Amino acid sequence: MKRRLLELDGVFPVVTTVFIVLLLTAIPSQGQTEDTNEWGRPNLEGIWLDVYATPFERAPELGDREFTTPEERAARDQALSSSAGRDRRGPPGSPQDVSGAYNAVYTSVKPTGPRTSLVVDPPNGRIPALTPQAAQDNERRREWRVMLMRNTPTCEQETPACEGGPYGPPSPRRFDVPPFYNTLRMNRHDGPEDQSLGDRCMLGATPDFNGFRRITQGEDAVAIGYDTGQGQGFQRVAYLTGTHPANQVRLRHGDSRGRWEERTLVIETTNFSPKFPFRGSSTNLTLIERYTRVDTDTLEYEVTIEDPTVWVAPWAIRQELKRQSDQQNRIYYEPRCHEGNYGLAAMFIGARLREAEFSEGRGPDPFSLDTTT
């Protein structure tokens, strides 16, 4: 097993998938069948993917309606395939043009799924309300991001990307240290801490609902490899023995302990790091995941998400995962991030050049430029 990154407590959502060709040949072990592995447990091994596009939350007007009609799915598929502006780009050479390098013309579109939302509990398909403290924390982060954007055309034109912030001169707080651990892209580029986790080649949170999942089973552990797209991904190991470590031990994707309940693999994950939050939840997050083999090509996945400091009630997601060809959809064993490895350094070089031009009177104030959205 690869060594996992440990840290001590107190230290401080449709994705494009990129494929790589590796030589992978599955060799059945003695006693293993299509449905059962050599230890007599359900065989969950393989590459699995949710092949449908499903809204994360249900539209409020649908109420408790769990499924769409064939006519609704056909209409949505038609709208996606012919959506205006899919080939739109910014002025050649502009920041908007460069940042939009992943033109939608070259991305695939999943067909619309039968469910009206991934969220199945509560019955209305909506994530429960935030606690007052979580809402306050979200507002504090939003205010900080907007503060760094206030002198840009984005806020001057009152576009949605300004998140309702006012237009005005650069804030005197723009050089301050953020009052929180940043995981999102900001309109400042002093160092890696100002960049998003994706820019820093640390994309992917647990749980993940978008990319491929490769499941590999052992006698006392189950490994799950995630491909989160564009050369990024991560590995998780759910141990079938032992207990969670002490509370002060924190892991990027938490500590996962699994057990079998008849034909279902149940994984409980705790001990998450504050540096890798899921929708604002981290150190108090608990996940209960359930993997159930439905048939040869179908795996049902359900996860219950609970953090009483963030949401007023637990909530659950359900997906139907389909087996993918091992030969046609091979994914990373060790994720790379070539764009980030080169792009992050280039971003800082460009930021320093802009600062030099401004100090010499040859260019605009960098804080008057939107280098975030």
Predicted features and spans:
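PEST-like low-complexity, intrinsically disordered acidic/proline/serine-rich tracts
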Residues: K2-L6, L24-T373
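Bacterial N-terminal signal peptides
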Residues: P13-A26
